Amino acid sequence: MDVENLIITTLKDKVEELTGNEMDIRLDEPPAINMGDYSTNISFRLAKDLKKAPKVIAEDIANSLNISGIEKIEAVNGYINFFMNYSDFSKETVSKIIDEKENFGKLEKRHEKVILEHTSANPNGPFHIGHGRNMVIGDSLKRILVASGYDVETQYYVNDMGRQEAIVVFGNEKFELDKSKKADHAIGEVYVETNKLLAENEELEQEILNLMKNYEEACEAGIENELTEKFKNAVDYSLGGFKETLSTLNIYHDKFVWESEFVKSGMVREVIKRLMDTGKVVEDEVFRLDLSDYGLEKKLVLARLNGTSLYSTRDIAYHINKMENCDFAVNLLGADHKLTAVMVNKTLALLGYNEAEVVFYEFISLPEGSMSTRRGRFISMDELFEEAKSRAAEEVRKRGVAESEEEIEEIAKKIAVGAVRYNIVRIAPEKPMVFRWDEALDFEKVGCPVIQYAHARCSRILENVEIISNDNLFAYEMNENEKTIVKLLSKLPKIVEKAAEVRKPQIVANYVLDVAQGFNKFYANCPVLKEENQIIKNSRIAIVNNTKMVLENTLDLLGIEMPGKM
C-alpha cells in the first residue's frame, strides 16, 4: 500500500468535489513524527475559491476523509496532518523488504537504452581527484539508473588523437619509461618531462604537429604502421593503469571507445561534409560552424584548412554514434566544458539528432591547494586512496576489531573506498568541494564509516539471533524511534526513482546517512536482544534485519561495500 499516493488521490478527489476543478497536490513531511507523517496546505490554496478561512476548510476536509492506512487526520491552523497506522504499515514494509531482499529499491524495467559516458580522462598521466569526482558521480549514477529500470551502457571516450597523446608518443622516444611504476604514473612522468623539453625548445612543437597529422592521415587511410603502433601501445599502457585505479574503486566501464575509430570509419569526414552542406560553415584561418541561430556568438572550430580534423569534430561524430545506439545519452563533464558541450549539442540539433544530457560538476580540491597535471603538481587518485586506506587501517587497529594484518587490510580497503566515494558523491556536483579527511573518515556524523558502522551493529545483533520470527509483528504501540526507522526504510524505491529522474546521486547518499542515523537512534533507545516482551523483541529484530538489507542495497548503488566489522 502506497499511503502517500493514496492520500494525494483522495485529496484530489475531494478538491474536485468541492470546486469542480483539478489541483496538483504535493505532500510535505512535518519536522517531527508526533506532528504527523504527511501534511498539506491545500486549505490555503482553496480559500479564495471557497470564500472560507483556511482553518475552517482544513477542519471540514479533515472531518470528511477516511483513508485506508491512516488512523488519524488533524486540522491544525489551516494545515491538514495525516498520521499513519504504524502497526499495519510496519508489517507491510518489513514483509516487502524480506520478500524482495537485494531487489528492494529496484524498479520495473523501462526498456530504454542509456549510454552514460564518464571519466574519459586523457591517457597522459594518472587520474587526479578532479577525474575522481567524475568517475564516482558517473558510476553512482549508472548504478542508480540501472536500479530504476534502464538498460545502461557506460562508455569511456579515449582521446588518442590529441596533442597530449602526441606529446606522450614523442616523449617515449626521448625518455625511458620507468617500468617499476604503475603504468599511468610512468606515462605521466614522461609527459611532464616532455613538456619541459618543449618549453625549452619551441622548434620541437612542429614535430608534435607532424605526429598528430601523420597519425590522423594513417587512421583515415586505414593504414597500420610503426606510428599507429606507437600511439596504440602508449594509450594501451596508460589505460592499463587507469583500469587498476577504477577497479580499486569498484568502477567498471562496459566499453572503451577510441577517438580514432571515427576517423578510421570515415564518420568524421562525413560529419564535416554534412556540416559544410548546411551553409553554416565559414572560412577564417580554419573552418568554423556558425551557431548563431541557436543563440551562440562563438563559432565552433570544425577543421583546419589543410583538412585535418579537430577534437570537436571527432566529438560530434562520437555523439552521433551514441545517439544512433541509445534512447538518450548522459555525459559527465567538468563545469569548464559548459560552452563546448552546448556547442556540440547544438551541432547535433542542426544535424537532426537529440541532444545529450550533461551532468556538470565543479572543481574539487584538497585543503593543500589545487592541481596541475602539466607541471606534475597534483594529487593522484591512487595517492588519495592509499592515504585513506592508511588512515582507515590506523583506526581499525585502534578499535581492535581485526584478528590479523590481512583482516586489517581487508577492512581498511572497504572503509577507504567508502570514505573516498561517499565523501565525493554526497556533495551536489554543481557545488565546488574541498575533500577533507576529517569528514571522509568521520565515524560519528557525516562520513561513510557512520553508515558502515550502523551495518556492522546490525550484523552483530543478528549473529545472536537463532530464528527471525515474523509472527504478530508490531502488535503494540510503537515508539517514535521505531516509527522513524521503519518509515525511512520504506522510502528506498522512491529515493531511487527520484535520484534517477533528476540525475542526482547525492539524493541516495543523503538518504542512506539518514537511515544510518535513524538506526543509531533506534539502537540507543530501543533494546533488542534484552527486550523481555517477545512480540516487541521480534519486531525490533525484524527492524534490524531490514535495516541491514536496506543499508546494503543503498550503498551498493554508490559502489560501496560493507566491512562487516568496524
Swiss-Prot record:
GO biological processes: arginyl-tRNA aminoacylation
Pfam families: Arg_tRNA_synt_N (PF03485), DALR_1 (PF05746), tRNA-synt_1d (PF00750)
Aminoacyl-tRNA synthetase found in the keyword field: yes
Keywords noted in UniProt: Aminoacyl-tRNA synthetase, ATP-binding, Cytoplasm, Ligase, Nucleotide-binding, Protein biosynthesis
UniProt GO molecular function: arginine-tRNA ligase activity; ATP binding
Subcellular location: Cytoplasm
Enzyme category, top tier: ligase
PROSITE patterns membership: AA_TRNA_LIGASE_I
E.C. no: 6.1.1.19
Predominant localisation class: cytoplasm
Family: Belongs to the class-I aminoacyl-tRNA synthetase family.
Name used for this protein in its record: Arginine--tRNA ligase
Name of encoding gene: argS
